[in-house]
Amino acid sequence: MRFRTADGVVIEGATFEDIANVLWQQVMVPELSLHDWMVENAKRAEMWDGTKLPVSSVEDHIRAMIAARHLVELSD
């Protein structure tokens, strides 16, 4: 899977968890855990454009980012 982020960076991974891990590590000061990153990312998304991202699972979080167009899937 390949995606373009809202700021134009192209990322890729085999699973939603891979994608989330790439996004987590791109934060200037990464949170201590992937779950903590999802919580903080959800806060940033809500402040940015009002999007409410779930933090119940990595898959739900990434799917919501795709639905909100925070991530745009690129064809191979």
Regions found by a protein language model. Name each.
Residues 50-76:
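Short, compact, well-ordered microdomains
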Residues 1-29:
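N-terminal acidic leader/helix
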Residues 23-55:
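Acidic, aromatic-enriched beta-alpha/helix-loop junctions
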